[in-house]
Amino acid sequence: MSLSIDVTSLPSISSSIFKNESSSTTSTLSGKSIGRSEQYISPDAEAFNKYMLSKSPEDIGPSDSASNDPLTSFSIRSNAVKTNADAGVSMDSSTQSRSSSNVGCDQLDFSLTKGINVNANLESCISISTDHKKEKSKKDKSRKHYPRIEADSDSEDYILDDSDSDDGKCKNCKYKKKYFALRMRMKRVAMQLIEDL
């Protein structure tokens, strides 16, 4: 996108401020001095005021407006800064002003060049595979298979032998049934814990 504006053909402005030449301002940028002076050329504004006041309101038309009147024309002189790769910034000036022959034909040149190139080619390829293969994970391979513990031996008909008793004193004691019930519950709890692990 490029934007170009012709500064030399701006509309005219009528004001009493433009009687005197403005002082040139100097700014410093990266150690280099860049100057710019602007000069506004305007005739006596009092003569224009007398001219406008001497006419009746009915006689004032578009040709008497401030933008089209020769008395309010001005020009801007600016110093052009030239750059040199070896010498840096120099203060050689180039003066350019608007000619007075274009009074009444103020124009603002506004050119807009805009180029947009859009490549909207879109290619998409979607493939969906529904084949599902179940593979054993490393955790399954590393898991050890413990032998299942059966509790069929714990029954009411089981009779303690001499090796399970304390000197054979508990072979037919009254706590035999409670002991085997407790032993069965403990074994089931142990089996459940092993399965959970």
UniProtKB/Swiss-Prot annotation:
Pfam families in UniProt: Rota_NS26
Protein residues bound to Mg(2+): 92
InterPro entries attached to this UniProt entry: Rotavirus_A/C_NSP5 (IPR002512)
Residues with PTM Phosphoserine: 67, 153, 155, 163, 165
GO MF annotation, one: ATP hydrolysis activity
One cellular component term from this protein's GO annotations in UniProt: host cell cytoplasm
Biased composition annotated in UniProt, kind: Low complexity: 17-30
UniProt main location, coarse: host cell
Cofactor: Mg(2+)
Cellular compartments annotated: Host cytoplasm
PTM: O-glycosylated.
Keyword line: Glycoprotein, Host cytoplasm, Magnesium, Metal-binding, Nucleotide-binding, Phosphoprotein, RNA-binding
Domain of life, source organism: Viruses
Protein's GO biological process: viral genome replication
Residue segments, region Disordered: 17-37, 53-72, 130-157
Function: Plays an essential role in the viral genome replication. Participates, together with NSP2, in the formation of viral factories (viroplasms), which are large inclusions in the host cytoplasm where replication intermediates are assembled and viral RNA replication takes place. Orchestrates the recruitment of viroplasmic proteins such as capsid proteins to these factories. Participates in the selective exclusion of host proteins from stress granules (SG) and P bodies (PB). Also participates in the sequestration of these remodeled organelles in viral factories.
Family statement: Belongs to the rotavirus NSP5 family.
HAMAP family recorded: ROTA_NSP5
Subunit structure, interactors included: Homodimer. Interacts with VP1. Interacts with VP2. Interacts with NSP2; this interaction leads to up-regulation of NSP5 hyperphosphorylation and formation of virus factories. Interacts with NSP6. Participates in the selective exclusion of host proteins from stress granules (SG) and P bodies (PB). Also participates in the sequestration of these remodeled organelles in viral factories.
Protein name in the entry: Non-structural protein 5
Species of provenance: Rotavirus A (strain RVA/Human/Philippines/L26/1987/G12P1B[4])
UniProt lineage: Viruses, Riboviria, Orthornavirae, Duplornaviricota, Resentoviricetes
